[in-house]
Amino acid sequence: MKYSVRYNRSLDLESFDEIIIELKDEKYEDLLGFFNRYSDKRIVIKIDDCSNFLEENKIELFKQLEEENPEFNYTFLLKKYDLDKKTEVIQLLYDNDFSYYVEDFISDEEEMWNAIRTGYSDVIITDSLCFYLEDIAPILHSYGINVRVFPNICQRKFLHGNDIKSFFIRAEDVKIYEPYVDIFEFWGEDNQQEAYKNIYSKSKQWVGPLNQYIIGFKEEVEGHHILPTFGERRLGCGRSCLKGGRCRLCDAYIQLSSTLKKNDLVLINEEMDAIQSKSEFINIDWYFWKNII
């Protein structure tokens, strides 16, 4: 699994695999210096203003950069809502053999195939389509496309949606998603990205309620009381529970977690072996200050 970070000089950027930067008025020397400093990272260059990119002929900066430093690893990112001139910029990048993708949240198969046909280097999979990762990831990978997700936000289209039936990834389930997801990008405040990254990549667990690190999750459910098979069952379930299917596994996981909590137990494997929990609740802000500052 690779971890992405939106550029913030207060963070330990070296601990991430990918850095997202916003393209503003940088000169060639500025870009070259940044790329040399983080030459072992993949750089995502976010184009905030397509009209300005065309008017300033900024493509020439990167043509020079590519010619002199073909070893640099980078792609372009176009803002989702910057409709003015976006198609023209995409065509320009395509004609000059630069990789790119758009900040579109891909939530169904039609959007996914449009991203494939448009030649995206990456796709951001969200909402219900995340419950088909087992099926769609091999397709996207066959086209050389990176699969990106936001693991730390409860994803649903409506506020009254069921939290546990929404898409998110527990810290304990990272290994399950690794064959299907290439890049984790974190939702939330820029200065907390490193805290989230440490939860998913170092701790790989969270002792406390899910709503302390899964943004938008309202229920008081402790992730470490959920059966270890939780993530695996959701990889390709297709959210059949919302289509008239009989699957009620997510509800069952919640009921079981409630029972385990009452008895201060944690399940450690599929054979239902349990151990006594020594849990202490942890707050994301406390974790942030303790581990980052």
PLM feature spans:
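Active-site pocket-lining/capping segments in soluble small-molecule metabolic enzymes
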Residues: 1-111, 118-293
